[in-house]
Amino acid sequence: ITPQMRPVFHLTPRVGWMNDPNGFSYYNGAYHMFYQYYPYRPFWGPMHWGHAVSKDLLHWNYLPAALAPDEPYENGGGCFSGSAIDLADGRQLLVYTGVLSEKQPDGTMHDVQQQCVAVGDGVNYEKCENNPVMTAKQLPSDSNRFDFRDPKVWKAADGSYRCVMVNCDNKGDGRAVLFESKDGFSWNFKAEVAVLLEEAVVD
């Protein structure tokens, strides 16, 4: 985009393609905006997390991509949407959906969605060695492994962490599922917190 055509009040990437905002947060004295990003061409590609910071939400400085799809558990398309939160030790935790392309019993390949984490200092981020930290294997037995994404993380009053994600059962009915963690790295399934019944769907 030429300087004359670039939006003033909307964040745009320096190059490439962008989509969903992710992990919007205030950390270490600045606003952090991450976003779905493919830096190599101006259209969809393996998803990265772009990263920009601002003091006033108007003037943005671009930082290196916070996440890039460089692990086997992201080989099905990249590092997809998620959120961010401060840890007790001062680091920032990114929680995101990693997509794994996996061979199924019938021989076909299918993208399996799972949740991963990375930690950093506001500029550089390192993925956790025990990723993925939340998988569909932890969900109820009727859960669809291919629709389990978009983690939203927050800190509970007792200092532990909660994370809610979207999922659906094997019939395709949507629901939200809740996980909990004491440290942000080891997660356990807690409950289904919302179920979208067929009669509640509005066309």
Residue positions per predicted region:
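Beta-rich carbohydrate-recognition and catalytic domains
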Residues: 1-150, 155-203
